[in-house]
Amino acid sequence: MPAIGIDLGTTYSCVGVYQHGKVEIIANDQGNRTTPSYVAFTDSERLIGDPAKNQVAMNPRNTVFDAKRLIGRKYDDPKIAEDMKHWPFKVVSDGGKPKIGVEYKGESKRFAPEEISSMVLTKMKETAEAYLGESITDAVITVPAYFNDSQRQATKDAGHIAGLNVLRIINEPTAAALAYGLDKNLKGERNVLIFDLGGGTFDVSILTIDEGSLFEVRSTAGDTHLGGEDFDNRLVTHLADEFKRKYKKDLRSNPRALRRLRTAAERAKRTLSSSTEATIEIDALFEGQDFYTKVSRARFEELCADLFRNTLQPVEKALNDAKMDKGQIHDIVLVGGSTRIPKVQSLLQDFFHGKNLNLSINPDEAVAYGAAVQAAILSGDQSGKIQDVLLVDVAPLSLGIETAGGVMTKLIERNCRIPCKQTKTFSTYADNQPGVSIQVYEGERAMTKDNNALGTFDLSGIPPAPRGVPQIEVTFDLDANGILNVSAKEMSTGKAKNITIKNDKGRLSQAEIDRMVNEAEKYADEDEKHRQRITSRNALESYVFNVKQAVEQAPAGKLDEADKNSVLDKCNDTIRWLDSNTTAEKEEFDHKLEELTRHCSPIMTKMHQQGAGAGAGGPGANCGQQAGGFGGYSGPTVEEVD
């Protein structure tokens, strides 16, 4: 059973598999190689991917996207407050965690970001299963290199809820470097800078690639909250202001108008990557008012100027951390859809004194490509190209504990290789102190109050002794997923305590994960029931229209009038029933089909036999077969719905 690689993106996701010595990026049921990270809830069903994004203007409040901007964060995170201004769906606090509120089948529901992401992951899993023709459980999932511990852990939980065994969480730029290194058959030692600007996150990583098989990450930097959506937001604000100026109407109060404007803005942004001007035309945008305008590339660049410039700071930081200067970088590789923006490219090129940028890998698919390779390696694939690949990644943030006076004492420095393990000895702060509280933080600031708290645990039962005498050994063990285990041991008694940092405030408990796994299965069952219902409805519709058409077109004398009227009456009754019972259950559709078949089949058979008698294989023969298949319907069960 193959393992798959999934690029779980803010706006789009992508899945790949390594087989027969190469990576296949797998297209979804719509034929697209990337799938929107959207989930929609309606009165009757749940939609994921393209169908969800396609109906967003009709159902903005119940269509959820950007779960990656919520995952592993706390509700009071200022970034979330900023995003909520742009989201049509509701985000509420549930014990300090953000939850998304929607209406589904007439009921109010609340979902954790992990659940929404798990639904997207389930869609990617099903896409791969349909292509490979077998069930899949093992996967590698990618995250931005700058994701912190809680964001990584939450992504792993999302995989678990989707029924996946997550072999490894790997960093997106590292996966892209893997794709680049294997695709280009690099020779010798090369320093490669991966510039990854996607829909919602931004990463820069510098790697040394040796003979195209040893991939060593030297440094990483980034912003987990900068990407194409932020550029869209600037353009939407500009267009909404223009609409208000021209027509004295503020469309911001209307989620549907705002959504249609956002879709047009996103399209215009894409156009501006290849043209210097984009036209926006939206009929009846708000209160019946049409909106026609033009946006020039120069205006778009001015609107996003500070955001574009901000992409260079992490580049500088990554170079400093890797102790390299600009001239030592051999290749600059662009990844992520937003790197198609000409201004982003020109700023980066100027920063590197006119050096050519490498545009040779597909920016939308490179990360999934690398993840698929890593999945094959971890599941023991020994084929030619990948058997020698060794990937050495680094920790994006420093990790440490709080010591007297609120000082951050680091045990693991940022950009140290992972997996890694560090031990330091600490002591008590007061005489006869019976226990110590180990508070774990991540971040680069000197004081813990400015860093991100990951978790706390207490080590008690320390024998009475003067301050500074007891020896407490604290060990940090950072695994290959970038997830931390911390243990503390009092040396004289041998008492020990350890935790996997599960970010008590932000993480899901095991019970919550189990509940979500069960709910995910329940939703999958509901989706399956809905699919079967639609299949039964389509079978009935198809049969009734085929029979009706065959009878209406039957040549004169082939069918007596009474039979013809009897069939037509029955068909018209069924069509009327269909029109007034659109939400009937599968069993009702099946029952109607059976009833209709019982009534029409003998007449159709008679008509068919007469036709065959009149002239074997005459036109009637085909009509009969088309219309009935004599009882059981075996015609097409798919109907195009416009």
UniProtKB/Swiss-Prot annotation:
GO terms for cellular component: cytoplasm; cytosol; nucleus; plasma membrane. Forms a complex with Hsp83/Hsp90 and Dpit47. One of its GO terms (biological process) is protein refolding. Keywords: ATP-binding, Nucleotide-binding, Stress response. It comes from the Eukaryota. The gene is Hsp70Ab. GO terms for molecular function: ATP binding; ATP hydrolysis activity; ATP-dependent protein folding chaperone; heat shock protein binding; protein folding chaperone. InterPro entries: ATPase_NBD, Heat_shock_70_CS, HSP70_C_sf, HSP70_peptide-bd_sf, Hsp_70_fam. The keyword ATP-binding applies. The keyword Oxidoreductase does not apply. Residues 612-634 have a biased composition (Gly residues). It comes from Drosophila melanogaster (Fruit fly). NCBIfam families: PRK00290.1 (NF001413). Induction: Heat shock induces the synthesis of seven proteins at five otherwise inactive sites in the polytene chromosomes of fruit fly larvae. Two separate sites, producing two and three copies, respectively, code for the 70 kDa protein. Expression is induced by proteotoxic stress caused by toxic protein aggregation, for example by overexpressed Atx-1/ataxin-1. SUPFAM superfamilies: Actin-like ATPase domain (SSF53067), Heat shock protein 70kD (HSP70), C-terminal subdomain (SSF100934), Heat shock protein 70kD (HSP70), peptide-binding domain (SSF100920). The lineage of its organism: Eukaryota, Metazoa, Ecdysozoa, Arthropoda, Hexapoda. This is Major heat shock 70 kDa protein Ab. Belongs to the heat shock protein 70 family. Stress-response chaperone protein that prevents toxic aggregation of proteins. Changing K489R: In strain: FrV3-1. There are 5 or 6 copies of the gene encoding this protein at two separate loci, 2 copies at chromosome locus 87A7 in reverse orientation (Hsp70Aa and Hsp70Ab) at locus 87A7, and 3 or 4 copies (depending on strain) at locus 87C1. Most strains have three copies at chromosome locus 87C1; two tandemly repeated Hsp70 genes (Hsp70Bb and Hsp70Bc) and one in reverse orientation (Hsp70Ba). Some strains, including that sequenced in the Drosophila genome project have an additional copy making three tandemly repeated Hsp70 genes (Hsp70Bb, Hsp70Bbb and Hsp70Bc). Residues 609-642 are annotated as: Disordered.
